[in-house]
């Protein structure tokens, strides 16, 4: 009898341990990547192929189509549709700037996220995939294409050099000549240009010409007005930027947000250029490139920004608007405007590009970094089938990492960079802008299984005795 009971207990414990130690099933409803971020065009197709998602998505679109959107969204059926769709691929989908069917992709994105927002938010999440490239990549390509670095020869007119470099590239020359011609074409005695056509031509230029050329035209470093004024004139501001009167900034924001494309570019600008005083550069993720890319993405829309003057001592950027007539919303308006005019992230990013510098960063929350050559005699033994690749280090990188630790993080003004990563960071966080979804429950289950295993023989021994 005792042996029979012991046998039953063994079977029970074995089954329990199997269930605890087994890997978790993928999140979501099936294995089609429901919780894996995909572009919104693909997400829309996945949703259409699943009956429940498809019907709820149609319901939500009807809820958002009415004039009184907030009242409709308060409806129980609309709320139920939103809850279901938050578990669908539509919730995590993103778009890519300049992608084919970009407008269609953004329409899908906002059809979900406008329903989730409670009224108008001051800052909205960006619908675009995060930018992972750095300014150093732009510098390298610029030197390859033009034969010189963006900031070489301090006595030269960098903006003139940028125009020359553009003229040497057929695509850049063609699209630049196209928008200058369109924006300078007089329509009538009362209408000196077509702003709509001018904006469209500008968007074609900045969306289709590589940043190696467009950045040099927009952000060239200037020491005199002979350079700074052509830089200000890059976007033909008398047509694309200036107007007879300055509208209220909040009114201009409302006009922009009425268009999915303009709304997306504005949200992306705030996401990548919003001043962060907890970072070295004042930029989110210390990424100058992401901020400058978002800035250029706004050109060619109602919210087009530009230099307010040809000053060489300070950089001031602003859309063509003011806060006059804001009434009770003056504080909100001033805050919105300061994100352009007094933005340390944007200013630092422009200056960094003009100077040909980028920031060299170590991880924000690193494991103990590698700062000295490993001592072989103290290294733990590894299995025979595993190569000890960590024992081979570049001494120049180690010296750089040590220097950063001793003297604090500084802007890297050299052409070549060496990033300081810990062993854990090198294997698990090589792309900091992308998130990895980890099931915390699964990890806990494996730990519990490890704790239970040693106790099994003791239980069996007591039963047998």
UniProtKB/Swiss-Prot annotation:
- One GO term (biological process): glial cell-derived neurotrophic factor receptor signaling pathway
| Record bears the keyword Magnesium | no
Localization of this protein:
Cell membrane
Q: Which residues are glycosylated?
A: 355, 387, 412
> Which keywords fit this entry according to its UniProt record?
Cell membrane, Disulfide bond, Glycoprotein, GPI-anchor, Lipoprotein, Membrane, Receptor, Signal
Pfam families per UniProt: GDNF
Query: What are the protein's GO molecular function terms?
Result: glial cell-derived neurotrophic factor receptor activity
Question: Which cysteines link up through disulfide bonds?
Answer: 40-93, 47-53, 63-78, 95-105, 159-220, 166-172, 183-198, 193-239, 222-227, 249-321, 256-262, 273-291, 283-345, 323-333
The annotated topology with respect to the bilayer is: Lipid-anchor; GPI-anchor
Top-level taxon in the UniProt lineage? Eukaryota
Which parts of this protein are propeptide?
Answer: 446-465
- Give the signal peptide, or none: 1-21
Q: Where is the lipid attached (GPI-anchor amidated serine)?
A: 445
What do the Gene Ontology cellular component annotations say? Answer: external side of plasma membrane; receptor complex
| SMART domains named in the record | GDNF
Q: Which family does it belong to?
A: Belongs to the GDNFR family.
Q: What does this protein do?
A: Receptor for neurturin (NRTN), a growth factor that supports the survival of sympathetic neurons. NRTN-binding leads to autophosphorylation and activation of the RET receptor.
Subunit organization? Interacts with NRTN ligand and RET: forms a 2:2:2 ternary complex composed of NRTN ligand, GFRA2 and RET receptor.
Full protein name: GDNF family receptor alpha-2
Which organism does this sequence originate in?
Gallus gallus (Chicken)
């Amino acid at each position: 009898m005792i042996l029979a009971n012991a046998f039953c207990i063994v079977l029970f414990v074995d089954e329990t341990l199997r269930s605890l130690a087994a890997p978790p099933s993928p999140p979501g409803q099936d294995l089609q990547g429901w919780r894996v971020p995909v572009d919104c065009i693909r997400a829309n197709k996945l949703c259409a192929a699943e009956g429940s998602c498809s019907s709820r998505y149609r319901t939500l679109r009807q809820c958002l189509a009415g004039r009184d959107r907030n009242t409709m969204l308060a409806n129980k059926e609309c709320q139920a549709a939103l809850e279901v769709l938050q578990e669908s691929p539509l919730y995590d989908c993103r778009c890519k700037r300049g992608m084919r069917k970009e407008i269609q992709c953004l329409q899908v994105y906002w059809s979900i996220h406008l329903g989730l927002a409670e009224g108008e938010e001051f800052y909205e999440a960006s619908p675009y995939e995060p930018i992972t490239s750095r300014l150093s990549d732009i510098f390298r390509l610029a030197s390859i294409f033009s034969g010189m670095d963006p900031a070489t020869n301090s006595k030269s007119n960098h903006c003139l050099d940028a125009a020359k470099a553009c003229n040497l590239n057929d695509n850049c020359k063609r699209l630049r000549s196209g928008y200058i011609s369109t924006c300078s074409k007089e329509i009538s005695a009362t209408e000196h240009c077509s702003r709509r056509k001018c904006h469209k031509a500008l968007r074609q230029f900045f969306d289709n010409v590589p940043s190696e050329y467009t950045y040099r035209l927009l952000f060239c470093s200037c020491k005199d007005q002979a350079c700074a004024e052509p830089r200000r004139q890059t976007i033909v501001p008398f047509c694309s930027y200036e107007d007879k009167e300055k509208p209220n900034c909040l009114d201009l924001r409302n006009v922009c947000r009425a268009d999915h494309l303009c709304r997306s570019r504005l949200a992306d600008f705030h996401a990548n250029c919003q001043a962060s005083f907890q970072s070295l550069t004042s930029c989110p993720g210390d990424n100058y490139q992401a901020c400058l890319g978002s800035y250029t993405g706004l050109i060619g829309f109602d919210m087009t920004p530009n230099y307010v003057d040809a000053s060489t001592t300070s950089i001031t950027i602003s859309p063509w608007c003011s806060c006059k007539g804001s009434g009770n919303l003056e504080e909100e308006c001033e805050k919105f405007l300061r994100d352009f005019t007094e933005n340390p992230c944007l200013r630092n990013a422009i200056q960094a590009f003009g100077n040909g510098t980028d920031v060299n960063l170590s991880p924000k929350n690193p494991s103990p970094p590698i700062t000295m050559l490993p001592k072989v005699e103290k290294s733990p033994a590894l299995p025979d089938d595993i190569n000890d690749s960590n024992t081979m280090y570049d001494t120049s990188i180690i010296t750089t990492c040590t220097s950063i630790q001793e003297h604090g993080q500084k802007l890297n003004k050299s052409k070549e960079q060496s990033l300081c990563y810990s062993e854990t960071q090198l294997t698990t966080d090589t792309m900091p802008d992308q998130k990895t979804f980890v099931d915390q429950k699964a990890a806990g289950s494996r730990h519990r299984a490890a704790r239970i295993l040693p106790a099994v023989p003791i239980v069996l021994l007591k039963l047998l005795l």
